[in-house]
Amino acid sequence: VANAKSGHPGAPMGLAPLAHLLWSRVMTADPKDSRWINRDRFVLSNGHACTLLYIMLHLMGYKLSMDDLKAFRQLDSLTPGHPEANHTDGVEVTTGPLGQGFANAVGLAMAQANAAAAFNRDGFELFNNRTYVFLGDGCMQEGVASEAASMAGHLGLKNLIAFYDDNHITIDGDTNCAFTEDVGKRFESYNWNVLTVKNGDEDLSALWDAIVKAQQEKERPTLVCVQTTIGFGSLNQGKASVHGAPLKEDDIAQLKTKFGFNPEEKFVVPHDVRDAYKSYADRGAAKHAEWLKLFEEYGKKYSKEYEEINRRIAQKLPEGWEKALPTYCLLYT
C-alpha cells in the first residue's frame, strides 16, 4: 500500500491472524490447479482489503509473484485495487461493492450443496467443500447482504462460514455514528449459528475453537463475529485514519520492528515462512490427488454422473440446451 501510495491497510492488518489460520490450518485448495472443483472457496466481500488476499495467494504459491505484489494498484497489473475474478489466479469472485461479495458467497455455498446432493453416493463423498467469507461493517450495512443472509438461513447452508470483521470503524469513523444494531441478533433471526471471538488480534485458540464449532454445525450457516482492531500494530490502530490511506514511514518502521522484521527491508518473506506455506500448499495438492483417485473409482460405478461432472468441469453446455429456451409468439408481422 505504501509502495503504491494508495490503498487500504487497516482491514488487512486486523484480519491477518485469521487469514493465516484459515490458509494454514483450515481451507483445502491446490494452488497448482486453482480450478479444482472440490476446493474450498474464499470470498473477500470487503474487497478493498485485497492486499491481504494477494499476500496469502502469493505465499500459497498461486500465480502471483513478488513483482506482482510490487505492482499493486498499477494499470494492467495482476493486483488491482479490488479483486477481479478470471484475472488474478485464486480469486473466486470480483468484489468491491460492499455486501455483494457476501451474496456471491451464498451463491457459491448453494452450488456446493447442490453438487453434493446431486452427485454424492455412499462411499463417494465427492463434494464436501465449504465457502468461507470475510465481511466488514460496510458490508453489514448493505441490503444485498441482508437479503442473501436471509436466503442462506432459510436454506440451512451449513457449508457457509462467514467472518464478520467487527472493528467498529468505517471510512466515516466510528460505527456509532450510523450503525448501532446488534448484528449477531439479526443473524440469529435469519436462522444462523452465531459465535463471537472477543480478541481476534491475538487469540488464535479462540479463533480455532470458533472455526471447529462452525464446521460441526449441521443445520445452519455460521457467522463468527470477530472483534478486531483495524490497523493492528500501527500507531493509528483503532482509528478511521488507518482505514484507507498508506501508513507513514515512521509507522511502518516501528511496525516492522515490533513484529520482528528488519525495518530497512521491503518485500521480504522469511525462508521459514515460505517453507511453512509450501507445506500447506503441498497438503492441498495431496488431498486433490486423493480426490482424483476417488473420482475415477466413482466413474466406474456411476458412469452417467461421472460424465455429467466432467461436462461441468469442462464448462460445456448440455446437449440440446437450446430446446429449453422459451419461445414467444409474434404479436405483429
Task: For every predicted segment, state its role.
Residues 31, 87-88, 94-279:
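Glycine-rich ThDP/TPP pyrophosphate-binding loop and its adjacent helix/strand module
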Residues 18, 255, 280-284, 295, ...:
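Polyanionic/metal-chelating signatures
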Residues 1-60:
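N-terminal amphipathic, basic-rich helices that act as targeting or association modules
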Residues 9-13, 33-35, 67-72, 84-88, ...:
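Short coil/turn segments at secondary-structure boundaries
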Residues 37-50, 74-83, 127-135:
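Short, mixed-charge aromatic SLiMs
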Residues 21, 25-29, 66-87:
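Acidic-glycine-rich active-site phosphate/pyrophosphate-binding loop
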Residues 2-6, 220, 261-265, 297-300, ...:
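Intrinsically disordered or highly flexible coil/loop and linker segments, enriched in small
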Residues 332-333:
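Conserved small/polar residues in nucleotide/adenosyl-binding loops
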